[in-house]
A protein has these predicted regions:
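Charged docking surfaces used in two-component/phosphorelay signaling
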Residues: 69, 158-334
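N-terminal Rossmann-like NAD(P) cofactor-binding subdomain of oxidoreductases
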Residues: 1-191, 227-228, 292-293, 297-303, ...
Length: 334
């Protein structure tokens, strides 16, 4: 079997570490792993298939001989190294938002638009975590009738803000338990026992950057430039896995039974929808999973042609690392 040299750019971060873990779990044909990070991490090691692999400093010369680069770094790092990656002949599967809306760069969720992988010119973008979870959950509904408009509210775990998010949540809980104060460093407000209805800065007409990512990326992935989307993104005191409440509106009636049938068969989805027996998606159940749980499917009482649903997914795995490795799997099948 052919093997590939795979680099992980940002190998010491939460998503980079998860990428290395998922490469092993999915038995991706890695002949050589090249973990890349900043100078301060160079010389340290990561475990891969039971071996210690030395981390190298990210530099333009580090991509020579690499077939696939999995990007788990911030926008500025992705933009800095993208030219060298493409020039080296590698394919850059980038988890940052740097290239997502570039018309020359495919934006891929393998369960939704795998065919777009063939259009790459050296860079493929991994969508925003909440976007991935949402479009995976709702895309099958388009086989019944095209979604005309969509309204979503996200409930995003603190680990979505990086490794410091869960630490801050736990520190605040402990401080409050002891009657002490704790000055937030990661979040703009106390997150323990609280909700923060802002993720990202203000970008357009009162919408945040995170909310605009959801709206713009969903259109591109589903090839629906005319789709109207409105979104509210909220940070919640949950450690891992994002949850999304979605209302979809169509030009014709779509029944709950129809929706359940197509979602139950949809790739990457698990139908968990039994309200009488208290069975529905919850972040605790989806953590460390690679599929999106979908439930609470019901009519939208404000629109005869509308449906509401609730979905949960692990934002570190399906929302980032696993989706990137699935894209790499599409590449090696070409």
């Amino acid at each position: 079997m052919k093997t590939y040299t795979v680099a992980v750019l940002g190998a010491t971060g939460a998503v980079g570490q998860e990428m290395i873990k998922v490469l092993q779990e999915r038995n991706f044909p890695v002949g050589k792993l090249v973990p890349l990070a900043s100078a301060r991490s160079a010389g340290k090691t990561v475990k891969f298939r039971g071996e210690d692999v030395t981390i190298q400093e990210a530099a333009d010369t580090a991509f020579k001989g690499v077939d696939i680069v999995l990007g788990a770094a911030e926008n500025d790092i992705a933009k800095k190294f993208a030219p060298a990656i493409v020039a080296s002949g590698a394919v850059f599967v980038d988890n940052s938002s740097a290239f997502r809306l570039n018309p020359e760069v495919p934006l891929i969720v393998p369960e939704v638009n795998p065919e777009d992988v063939k259009n790459h010119k050296g860079i493929i973008s991994n969508p925003n975590c909440s976007t991935i979870i949402t479009v995976t959950a709702v895309n099958a509904l388009n086989t019944i009738a095209p979604i005309r408009t969509m309204t979503a509210s996200t409930y995003q775990a603190v680990s979505g803000a990086g490794a410091g998010g869960p630490i801050e949540l736990m520190n605040e809980v402990e401080a409050l338990r002891e009657g002490k104060t704790y000055e937030p460093k990661v979040f703009s407000h106390q997150i323990a026992f609280n909700l923060i209805p802002q993720i990202g800065g203000e970008q357009f007409e009162g919408y945040t950057s995170e909310e605009m990512k959801m709206q713009n990326e969903g259109r591109k992935i589903m090839h629906r430039p005319e789709l109207k989307v409105s979104c509210t993104c909220v940070r919640v005191p949950v450690v891992r896995s994002h949850s999304i409440s979605v209302s979809c509106h169509f030009d014709v009636p779509v029944t709950v039974e129809q929706a359940r049938e197509v979602i139950a068969k949809a790739p990457g989805c698990k139908l968990v929808d039994d309200l009488k027996n208290k069975q529905y998606p919850m972040p605790l159940d989806t953590s460390d999973q690679d599929i999106v749980f979908v439930g609470r499917i019901r009519p939208d009482l404000t629109d005869d042609n509308g449906l509401c649903l609730w979905c949960c997914g692990d934002q570190v795995r399906k929302g980032a690392a696993t989706n990137a490795i699935q894209i790499a799997e599409l590449l090696v099948k070409e």
